[in-house]
């Protein structure tokens, strides 16, 4: 009888571990589109609703071959602007950035794209003794495709009769510390 209880307990634990592993895999291979509706009197000069798409923290992840699933989802939103909040790549020595580059290069064909660095891009930018000129090459390739980088910078654009300020704040690596 005790052996049966041990086997049942082990089976329950094994099933729980398998279910957890399956959920982790599902989370890693899916993304969620969330819609927010913002209203403000300051936006009254818009002649139609504005769709702003925000991307961040993809960390070189690929959704389908050449990110086709993600790109289709972006296209289906018909964005007026795309804002990138950084960490599109992995800032670790020897880690290629091709996945992020290939996706982001395709976005300016849809609408204007504004990019602010996250801690991974910032690490590559600051730590040239490790990364060499990798950040500058990555940035130049994206700028050549039409991406606008905002590094402690702002751009003022007009949408309808409304002026909109898009700002990018660049934080030094020293700010990105783990909480203890």
What are these regions (language model features)?
Residues 1-43:
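N-terminal membrane-anchoring alpha-helices
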Residues 33-35, 55, 166:
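Hydrophobic residues on conserved beta-strands that form the core of alpha/beta folds
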Residues 34, 48, 162:
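Residue-level signal for beta-strand positions within conserved beta-sheet cores that form or flank
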Residues 41-47, 159-160:
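A short, structured loop/turn motif at beta-sheet edges
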Residues 42, 56, 117, 153, ...:
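Residues at the C-termini of beta-strands that transition into short coil/loop
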Residues 46, 50-148:
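Membrane-embedded segments
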Residues 75-80, 106-112, 144-148, 153-180:
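His/acidic metal-ligating clusters that form di-metal
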């Amino acid at each position: 009888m005790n052996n049966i209880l041990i086997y049942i307990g082990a089976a329950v634990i094994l099933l729980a571990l398998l279910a957890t592993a399956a959920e982790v895999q599902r989370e890693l291979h899916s993304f969620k589109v969330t819609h927010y509706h913002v209203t403000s009197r300051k936006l009254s000069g818009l002649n139609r609703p504005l769709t702003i798409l925000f991307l961040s923290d993809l960390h070189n992840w690929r959704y389908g071959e050449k990110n086709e699933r993600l790109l289709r989802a972006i296209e289906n939103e018909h964005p007026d602007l795309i804002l990138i909040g950084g960490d599109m790549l992995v800032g670790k020595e020897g880690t290629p950035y091709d996945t992020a580059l290939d996706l982001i290069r395709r976005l300016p064909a849809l609408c204007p794209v504004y990019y602010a660095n996250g801690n991974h891009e910032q690490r590559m930018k600051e730590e040239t003794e490790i990364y060499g000129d990798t950040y500058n090459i990555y940035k130049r390739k994206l700028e050549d495709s039409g991406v606008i980088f905002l590094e402690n910078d702002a751009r003022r654009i007009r949408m309808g009769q409304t002026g909109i300020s898009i700002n990018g704040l660049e934080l030094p690596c020293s700010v990105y510390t783990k909480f203890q």
